[in-house]
């Protein structure tokens, strides 16, 4: 009998996307091939405590469950020696947002010398930062929305011109989006059209980050595609998101079962547009050095221009998430998708073991 691969499914975390992580983890646990994998859920509470496996299963059944015997991690050895933690063959992190998809957790796996699913340290960190993603996308000719960046010290200087809506509007137009540079799932994002909304949006965004992006609004339809793999990635088809008039693809619309946003897979678009979305996705995936997986989001303008909005290195796996739905449409069902994600993570690890880390 073939020995099953032991998978450590890490979820939760001290993140604004804590609840999304639990839903994604539950779906992955239900869908994973139990004949190939033994799954060990590892719950990180919102306070940053590690729970044992028994309690981790309980919170998957009831997200409101509170940990009874938390194990506070003070250093790496604490994590490695977590009580009742089996010998894990590969980690599958599904911790969304800060500390989960920004390279921090990935760096920990590297220190532990363990394979893991999803992007490596550099790609996770770069794609979490919306400004760096834009800069790299421009390098390979992928259009992005015009923007300015406001740092915390600039926000604290109340005389800074970047806080003046009218002056910013001269560059970006009066219709803008304000968003934390290092957040996902549209957390802290606001749509503004006047000075009062702009001031309130900056205040909200700086609750989540020390760097905030102010972008011109790109009119049109939101389109997304999904990418899987390492050196020779597979780009799925394209999905289209239709939002209710006057709304955008907000946190609520992304994860609420009563969302007013409608997902259309495959997108009903000309083949030329489909090809551009997929081609741009591959360029951005490669220039940001992604591996494993990513969801690439863009806006399609009425004039047919495809403008990159975001690279999500750890896309959602909820019931309404675009990433698994796009691959299902491409002929890769949920269970097979999870298997392939684990396989490409282990392949990357095996390759890195062949590299020299010291000079003889």
UniProtKB/Swiss-Prot annotation:
Q: Where does Mg(2+) 2 bind?
A: 310, 312
One cellular component (GO) term of this entry:
cytosol
Q: Name one Pfam family in it.
A: Dala_Dala_lig_C
Q: Which cofactor does it need?
A: Mg(2+); Mn(2+)
Q: Please list every transmembrane segment annotated in the UniProt record, as residue ranges.
A: none
Classify the main location.
cytoplasm
**What is one GO biological process annotated to this record?**
cell wall organization
Q: Which UniProt keywords apply?
A: ATP-binding, Cell shape, Cell wall biogenesis/degradation, Cytoplasm, Ligase, Magnesium, Manganese, Metal-binding, Nucleotide-binding, Peptidoglycan synthesis
Q: In which pathway does it act?
A: Cell wall biogenesis; peptidoglycan biosynthesis
* Keyword Nucleotide-binding in record: yes
Where found, per UniProt? Cytoplasm
Question: Which of this chain's residues are annotated to bind Mg(2+) 1?
Answer: 297, 310
EC assignment: 6.3.2.4
Q: Name one GO molecular function term.
A: D-alanine-D-alanine ligase activity
Cofactor detail note: Binds 2 magnesium or manganese ions per subunit.
The residue ranges of the ATP-grasp domain are 134-343
Provide the catalytic activity annotation: 2 D-alanine + ATP = D-alanyl-D-alanine + ADP + phosphate + H(+)
Tagged with keyword Manganese: yes
Binding residues annotated for ATP, in chain numbering: 169-224
Family membership: Belongs to the D-alanine--D-alanine ligase family.
* Annotated function: Cell wall formation.
Q: What is this protein called?
A: D-alanine--D-alanine ligase
Could you tell me which species this protein originates from?
A: Lactobacillus helveticus (strain DPC 4571)
Q: What is the lineage of its organism?
A: Bacteria, Bacillati, Bacillota, Bacilli, Lactobacillales
């Amino acid at each position: 009998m073939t020995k099953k691969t032991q998978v450590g499914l890490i979820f939760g975390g001290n993140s604004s996307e804590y609840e999304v992580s639990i839903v994604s983890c539950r779906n992955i646990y239900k869908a994973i091939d139990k004949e190939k994998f033994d799954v060990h859920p590892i719950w990180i509470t919102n306070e940053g405590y590690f729970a044992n496996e028994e309690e981790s299963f309980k919170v998957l059944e009831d997200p409101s469950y509170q940990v009874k015997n938390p194990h506070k991690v003070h250093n790496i050895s604490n994590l490695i020696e977590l009580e009742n933690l089996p010998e894990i063959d590969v980690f599958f992190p599904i911790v969304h947002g800060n500390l989960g998809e920004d390279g921090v957790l990935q760096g920990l796996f590297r220190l532990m010398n363990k394979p893991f699913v999803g992007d490596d340290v550099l790609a996770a960190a770069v794609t979490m930062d919306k400004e760096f993603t834009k800069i790299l996308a421009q390098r390979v000719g992928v259009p992005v929305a015009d923007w300015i960046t406001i740092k915390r010290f600039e926000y604290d200087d109340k005389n800074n011109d970047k806080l003046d809506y009218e002056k910013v509007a001269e560059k970006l137009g009066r219709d803008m989006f304000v968003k934390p540079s290092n957040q996902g799932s549209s957390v802290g994002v606001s749509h503004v059209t006047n000075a009062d909304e702009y001031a309130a949006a900056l205040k909200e965004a700086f609750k989540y980050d020390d760097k905030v992006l102010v972008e011109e609004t790109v009119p049109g339809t939101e389109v997304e595609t999904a990418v899987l793999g390492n050196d020779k990635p597979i780009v799925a088809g394209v999905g289209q998101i239709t939002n209710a008039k006057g709304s955008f693809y907000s946190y609520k619309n992304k994860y609420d079962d009563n969302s007013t946003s409608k997902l259309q897979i495959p997108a009903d678009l000309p083949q030329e547009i489909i090809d551009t979305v997929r081609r741009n996705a591959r360029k951005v995936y490669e220039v940001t050095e992604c591996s494993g997986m990513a969801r690439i989001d863009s806006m399609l303008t009425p004039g047919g221009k495809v403008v990159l909005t975001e690279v999500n290195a750890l896309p959602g796996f909820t019931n309404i998430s675009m990433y698994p739905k796009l691959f299902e449409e491409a002929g890769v069902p949920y269970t097979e998708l999870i298997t392939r994600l684990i396989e490409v993570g282990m392949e990357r690890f095996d390759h890195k073991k062949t590299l020299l880390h010291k000079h003889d």
